[in-house]
Amino acid sequence: MIEQAVADLWLPIAVLIMRASWVSPRKGQANVSQMHYARQGVVTEEMAYVAKRENLPESLVMEEVARGRMIIPANINHTGLEPMAIGIASKCKVNANIGASPNASDAAEEVNKLKLAVKYGADTVMDLSTGGVNLDEVRTAIIDASPVPIGTVPVYQALESVHGSIEKLDEDDFLHIIEKHCQQGVDYQTIHAGLLIEHLPKVKGRLTGIVSRGGGILAQWMLYHHRQNPLYTRFDDICEIFKRYDCTFSLGDSLRPGCQHDASDAAQLAELKTLGELTRRAWKHDVQVMVEGPGHVPLDQIEFNVKKQMEECNEAPFYVLGPLVTDIAPGYDHITSAIGAAMAGWHGTAMLCYVTPKEHLGLPNAEDVREGLIAYKIAAHAADIARHRPGARDRDDELSRARYNFDWNKQFELSLDPERAKEYHDETLPADIYKQAEFCSMCGPKHCPMQTKITEEDIEGLEKVLEARGAAELTPVKLDKAD
């Protein structure tokens, strides 16, 4: 599959060849995490590569990784990976979810979804397969084909391994699956360790209860066994596993709100406090962490949610699903959530998990993946502009120049979705001659305002005329009402 990635030119060939040599000397060491090296003052090859991608000094990348404000999810067994960064100092990133369900899809289709997600700009991809196929086969196929970091939710496979019987799951089952995912090259795993048994009564006043699949599994486990969350009690053991592979924690928010009514409630905030504790525990092991967030949040509560996470979790990168800012638009939740995502990114969220038009309705197909990703690339880019990240607006300015100069092909090329931009233009003006035309079908050949080209000479000449006439002539005449 790596050979196919080279053939597809997904990655610079040098990276595919070089990363294997980067990680080879590290294998077998007790701790191979990027944070571990950064805290020793070592700039790894991954850090240097990320610094170039982000146009940041290598020293800053190392300092941010050591501090925990930046992560580089890069399992040493995922050698076909192009290193990337998630953190407040880097550009806002977008994750795409794919995965087979018991009712739909197979390994080949999921790899095709991966390719589509990468094509449309996914910075990371999560495999959320829950059953119906050989989960290990699907996961390894995705990892082998992927140039971007791959994330998983191991509790799904833990439950599948006992054929859905919660009562048969024990603590070792969870840890066995977690290590298997690390061995296969998973770069980050959603670990729902922040949901405690004492949190469960706090969901009583909610409209939608627990909407996290992983959180729901662990809630059922605790209710059946009347014991504490095993991912919490065995958290240090998970850290020991993660640091051997440089797998990153994505601390799951099991109690994220599933509707506007439940946003920022006691259950959500109680779990967030525990996630802060777990972040610091992972850092003691030099293990990288990002923290997951809601969900469904009204616009006026988004800033509070981002700042609260930064406060509780010591500014570990925040990774949010949406959030959706209204609940009344099934079929359009890529829009309702992209609105919230842009605002969350503006306030400091490091990565946005895309939502597709199929959210709450069904398993996304290829077109849904495209629609969701483009919506979220827009949101992330808007956040980068709002945060004044260096170079964030360069592409906008270049496209605007092309638009003003009626350079249609350049406009298409610079678009987030060049195929869609060209398709819409060509619906009414398909002939090649119209690629040089100084109009589109909206205004036609005579009414496009951008045909009015005002030069510096025009302005200078006008200024001289105005100066000669004097300001008095330019003062508006007040007419009497009778006139």
From Swiss-Prot:
Binding site for substrate: N97, M126, Y156, H192, S212, R213, G214, D253, S254, L255, R256, E292, Y319
InterPro entries assigned: ThiC, ThiC/Bza_core_dom, ThiC/BzaA/B
UniProt cofactor note: Binds 1 [4Fe-4S] cluster per subunit. The cluster is coordinated with 3 cysteines and an exchangeable S-adenosyl-L-methionine.
Binding sites annotated in the UniProt record for [4Fe-4S] cluster: C440, C443, C448
Signal peptide positions on this chain: none
Domain of life (superkingdom): Bacteria
Keyword Repressor: no
Single Gene Ontology BP annotation: thiamine biosynthetic process
Keyword vocabulary terms for this entry: 4Fe-4S, Iron, Iron-sulfur, Lyase, Metal-binding, S-adenosyl-L-methionine, Thiamine biosynthesis, Zinc
Keyword Iron tagged: yes
Reactions it catalyzes: 5-amino-1-(5-phospho-beta-D-ribosyl)imidazole + S-adenosyl-L-methionine = 4-amino-2-methyl-5-(phosphooxymethyl)pyrimidine + CO + 5'-deoxyadenosine + formate + L-methionine + 3 H(+)
Pathways per UniProt: Cofactor biosynthesis; thiamine diphosphate biosynthesis
Top-level enzyme category: lyase
Residues the entry annotates as binding Zn(2+): H296, H360
Enzyme Commission designation: 4.1.99.17
A GO CC annotation given for this chain: cytosol
A GO term for molecular function: zinc ion binding
The protein's role, per its UniProt record: Catalyzes the synthesis of the hydroxymethylpyrimidine phosphate (HMP-P) moiety of thiamine from aminoimidazole ribotide (AIR) in a radical S-adenosyl-L-methionine (SAM)-dependent reaction.
Family (UniProt): Belongs to the ThiC family.
Name by which UniProt lists this protein: Phosphomethylpyrimidine synthase
Gene expressing this chain: thiC
